[in-house]
A protein has these predicted regions:
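Non-heme di-metal
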Residues: 1-190
Length: 190
């Protein structure tokens, strides 16, 4: 089985980490799908936007898988990350949606733009195009968080402000990350 580096040192390792992480975005899609199920009280427009978000995350996973295969990696040789399922299942749909849109996706732009620059500097236009496409989707998803989190707060009678909820979600993800072992122990090996 291949070991998956957490951070790459060489260009090839860095590129691998980027697209391996994209290949794991089905977890994001499934967490969003759970939100669809759990938010029957929300208006149709929310479900419409969330369904599009789910489709985008599925596409990102497919993009990552396709790029890894183009680069010569066999998906069957790579472990599947599972650590996000464990902590996101314990969050209510409001916290989960805020965490995913206003924390996780909203804080990824600098890293993703750096990836695009790295790919372009190394003449890898395919990877740069994939990552640029992902950035555009994530911008839309962050905007959905700005639109829907305040409405979710009202619908579910949560007295926190958007800022208070976002800060809580930042603390939650920081705690979870600090508890992850630095090994592949949180992955399913195929």
């Amino acid at each position: 089985r291949a070991e998956v580096p957490r951070e790459g040192k060489t260009f090839e390792e860095k590129r691998f980490v980027v697209f391996y992480n994209h290949s794991q975005e089905m977890q994001f899609a499934e967490s969003l799908g759970a939100i669809l199920w759990e938010t029957a009280e929300m208006p149709w427009a929310f479900h419409f936007d969330l369904a599009r978000h789910v489709a985008d995350e599925v596409r990102h996973a497919q993009m990552g898988q396709a790029r890894l295969e183009q680069l010569g990696h066999r998906l069957a040789d790579l472990p599947m990350m599972t650590q996000h399922y464990a902590f996101r299942r314990n969050l209510d749909p409001l916290e989960r949606f805020c965490l995913m849109t206003l924390v996780m996706e909203a804080t990824a732009f600098e890293r993703k733009r750096t990836n695009v620059e790295l790919f372009e500097a190394n003449g890898d236009t395919d990877s740069a195009r994939y990552e640029s496409y992902d950035i555009r989707d994530e911008m839309q998803h962050t905007n959905l968080g700005h639109v829907w989190v305040p409405i979710l707060l009202r619908v579910y009678h949560d007295s926190r402000s958007v800022t208070e909820l976002t800060d809580h979600c930042r603390q939650t993800i920081a705690q979870v990350i600090s508890e992850y072992p630095a090994s592949a122990a949180n992955m399913i090996k195929r």
